[in-house]
Amino acid sequence: MWTPRIAVNHWLLVTTAIFGFLTFIWIPQASAECQTRSIYCYECDSWTDARCKDPFNYTALPRDQPPLMTCNGCCVKMVRHQRSPYEVVRRMMCTSQLQINLFMVDHVCMMESSGNGHMCFCEEDMCNSSKDLHTNGCQLHLITIAVAMSWLMGQLLSR
């Protein structure tokens, strides 16, 4: 007999399978690309280097711009508002300097839990220079959908 509980379980199984398949296809491709080729990333810290600011002065001589480094991972940009929204500390680097699993972070921007900062990852030459570094978004949408579905299923199954 087809009951609402069976329908919900069936829907959850199908949706989980689709989500798992999409995650299996999209995320490893992006991570593999990020790990297999070298790119150039800016490396600087605005706390100690005045050249590390948004936006960069692209008309300045190379010695007056933040240093570039060869990166065998993704570029990283961390921005943190210290004491006020106007006092911003920026740090740019390569993921090889962090203890981070690229499978989890590629094309992602993560907000600090306090809301005072964020960390973004990208995989093109000098991409961590951008003032408006944004995420690709497809993984964020999938994660949001998965969390919403989990909550909804929990609500439906608890009845």
Swiss-Prot record:
Segment forming the signal sequence: 1-32
PTM section of the record: N-glycosylated probably on Asn-57.
Glycosylation sites: 57
UniProt-annotated stretches for the region Loop 1: 54-67
Topology versus the membrane: Lipid-anchor; GPI-anchor
Region (Loop 2): 77-91
Claim: Transmembrane is one of the keywords in the record: yes
Domain of life: Eukaryota
Main location: membrane
Tissue: Expressed in mushroom body (at protein level); overlaps with expression of Sh/shaker and nicotinic acetylcholine receptor (nAChR) components also involved in sleep regulation. Expressed in the adult brain and head. Enriched in the mushroom body, anterior optic tubercle, superior protocerebrum, antennal nerve and visual projection neuron fibers projecting into the lobula plate of the optic lobe.
Lipidation positions, renumbered (GPI-anchor amidated asparagine): 128
Record's GO cellular component terms: external side of plasma membrane; membrane raft; plasma membrane
Propeptide: 129-159
Stretches that traverse the bilayer: 137-157
Disulphide linkage map: 41-75, 44-52, 71-94, 109-120, 122-127
One of the protein's GO biological processes: rhythmic process
Keyword terms of this UniProt record: Biological rhythms, Cell membrane, Disulfide bond, Glycoprotein, GPI-anchor, Lipoprotein, Membrane, Signal, Transmembrane, Transmembrane helix
Pfam families per UniProt: QVR (PF17064)
Classification via InterPro entries: QVR-like (IPR031424), Sleep_regulator (IPR050975)
Family statement drawn from the similarity comment of this UniProt entry: Belongs to the quiver family.
Record's function text: Bifunctional regulator of neuronal activity in the mushroom body, and possibly other regions of the brain, that acts as a signaling molecule required for homeostatic regulation of sleep under normal conditions and after sleep deprivation. Reduces neuronal excitability by enhancing Sh/shaker K(+) channel activity; possibly by stabilizing Sh/shaker to increase protein levels, accelerating its activation kinetics, slowing C-type inactivation and enhancing recovery from inactivation. Specifically affects the A-type K(+) current.
Domain notes: Consists of a single Ly-6 domain, adopting a three finger fold stabilized by 5 disulfide bonds. The first loop contains a region essential for protein folding or that is required for localization to the cell surface. The second loop mediates protein-protein interactions.
Oligomeric and partner information: Interacts (via loop 2 of the three-fingered Ly-6 domain) with Sh/shaker; this interaction may stabilize both components of the complex and may be required for targeting or retention of Sh/shaker to neural cell projections. Interacts (via loop 2 of the three-fingered Ly-6 domain) with nAChRalpha3 and potentially other nicotinic acetylcholine receptors; this interaction is required for antagonism of nicotinic acetylcholine receptors.
Protein name: UPAR/Ly6 domain-containing protein qvr
Organism of derivation: Drosophila ananassae
High-level lineage: Eukaryota, Metazoa, Ecdysozoa, Arthropoda, Hexapoda
